[in-house]
Amino acid sequence: MRADRPIGTFLLLWPTLTALTIAGNGKIEIYLLIVFCIGAFLMRSAGCVINDYFDQDIDKKVFRTSTRPLATGKVNNFEALSLFVFLLSLSALLLIFLNFLSFLVATSLAILVSFYPLAKRIMKIPQIVLGIVFS
């Protein structure tokens, strides 16, 4: 989940809060601020979990990532996937506070979050997927 490294959540929040500010003519409703802050944390965490799941064999060989829980065996595949589903489920619960268009966008982005680790294997520039997710 990398909760100890909040920079990823902040990177997700930057464009989100900018869009909310523009959409609200300079004002962000407090409930939207709460929903989107929690959502950014949950989805960034879900993205980290699924990325670590798909990259665990690579992570074992790279010094920077060799201590990640899946790479070391501290967490098994079932636990990681269960956490991923749990984080996605919590994120989905947040959608009850938003409109249908937000639901469609969020669902599409959840698919892209799940696809990014695989995109690294089949695309020359998988950062495009991340760029779409982060925007």
Across the structure, where does each feature detected by a protein language model lie?
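The first (N-terminal) embedded transmembrane alpha-helix
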Residues: A3-I22
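Hydrophobic alpha-helical transmembrane segments of integral membrane proteins
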Residues: R2, L11-L12, V113, I122
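Residue-level signature of catalytic and energy-coupling elements of molecular machines
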Residues: M1, D55, P126
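Hydrophobic, aromatic-rich alpha-helical transmembrane segments
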Residues: R5-T9, N25, E29-L33, C37, ...
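Membrane-embedded alpha-helical segments that form the functional core of polytopic membrane enzymes
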Residues: T16-L17, T21-F54, R64, L88-A92, ...
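Intramembrane alpha-helical segments
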Residues: R68-S135
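Short, cationic motifs built from Arg/Lys/His that form the positively charged side of catalytic pockets
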Residues: R2, T65-R68
